[in-house]
Amino acid sequence: MTTLKFIVPLIVLTACTDRQSGVINAKQSTGKDTVFKHDTIFYTNNNWQDGFGLTHDPEVDSIWSKPVKFYIDNPRCSPIAIDFYQGQFRPTDNNTTAALLSLATTNDNQLRPFYRWCLNKTIQIQDGALAEYTGVPARQYAEKFPKEFFEYMDYDTTGDKYKDWIAAISYSGFYDKDDYKNPLEIRKHLTQTMKQNCINCNEQLKKRIDKFAADCFP
């Protein structure tokens, strides 16, 4: 009986502690200010998408000259990406975030612009631990689709997007095999991969690839 009296207050205390956390286990709560998605629950009482320019009307919002409805109505579209657009999933340092960002290198030409947008917006809001997750997928996208990458960068005439991506790759865009103390070797691998994937690559684009590699790993 004494043991039970001790356990009950402990359970109550644990529940209160969990309720104060921004991310809790999906099996523990049904609070009205939370959204159940995947393996986590995120509180949604703060608008973390400020500055995204969204109305959350998929027929009004557009990404890469197409309404968002074009992407989210596609039966192949990832639910994680849809949740991200709707503001129901905020990236943080977990496996769901890693899965979302890895979608940017998909071979699906119809959905890739949407996934790339998710990666770009995550780069915009990254801080702390989240910054550890953006560099590799950003580098992989640039390596796999070099022409598309530069076209995407050029769409922003301010140059801020390019700087953001450079910062992300410079910070966390190292592969396991990379020697961070040898940036010359990393640049060599990066330029070789991009040029191999750059079909009918002219000299101007090759020079841009060289500069990009130098910017990422000076």
Question: Where are the language model's segments positioned?
Answer:
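Amphipathic alpha-helical scaffolding segments comprising HEAT/armadillo-like alpha-solenoid repeats
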Residues: 61, 65, 77-83, 111-120, ...
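C-terminal motif of bacterial Sec signal peptides marking the signal peptidase cleavage site
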Residues: 14-15
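Bacterial Sec signal peptide processing site at the extreme N-terminus
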Residues: 18-28
